A protein has these predicted regions:
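C-terminal structural segment of proteins
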Residues: 1-196
Length: 196
């Protein structure tokens, strides 16, 4: 709940963090849930992990020290202790969206897009596997966000984000949602950049 109401964090992320947690079950549950539990568990359905993965974020481990969240997500669970989550205040634009079968259900797919320090990032969770980060390795957005570059990146993301099926949705549907949501989020980033 603190994430949802934190004015500084939401100003920094253009309300992306608020958007990521507002549909999590209910206020009572959000009051009890912890950021550390969501990050440490690396749950596939985690809205929190998805949104923080798109940022310049690090985890500090008791024994392992400070490592980028993108590395931590790929590691196997161990007995180390998560001490803190560190969000670098690198200048950027952020956006988040998810699709749910019901408003308080786990997401069918969750996406966060960002441009941080000139690097475009797309984080996709509820694939139904762990959230993963896709960077613009092909340079499709290197000339900036235009209608064509956004559409090309969205099609590329659809092909490069592996999805699976479960009782919430099929893999093909999820892949299509990756394309649609990444387009929407990048268009939102483009609008945000116009105002800066």
């Amino acid at each position: 709940r603190q994430l949802e109401l934190h004015r500084g964090l939401n100003n920094y992320t253009q309300n992306s963090v608020r958007d990521a947690v507002k549909d999590i079950v209910g206020i009572q549950f959000r009051n009890l849930a912890t950021v550390g539990g969501s990050i440490w568990g690396r749950f596939g359905f985690s809205d929190v992990l998805t949104v923080f993965l798109a940022m310049d974020t690090y985890v500090e481990l008791y024994q392992g020290g400070r490592i980028p969240l993108r590395e931590f997500v790929g590691q196997k669970p161990d007995q180390d202790i998560l001490v803190r989550l560190v969000i670098k205040k690198t200048s950027g634009c952020f956006s988040y969206a998810s699709v749910r079968n019901q408003s308080t259900d786990f997401p069918v797919i969750a996406c966060a897009a960002s441009v941080v320090g000139g690097e475009y990032r797309l984080s996709v969770g509820a694939r139904p596997g762990r959230a993963m980060l896709l960077l613009d390795e092909e340079g499709l957005l290197s000339e900036g966000l235009t209608e064509d570059s956004i559409e090309n990146f969205a099609m590329w993301a659809e092909k490069h984000i592996p999805t699976g099926s479960n009782h919430r949705a099929g893999a093909k549907y999820r892949s299509r949602l990756v394309r649609v949501l990444s387009q929407r989020l990048l268009n939102k980033l483009r609008e945000e950049q116009k105002w800066r």
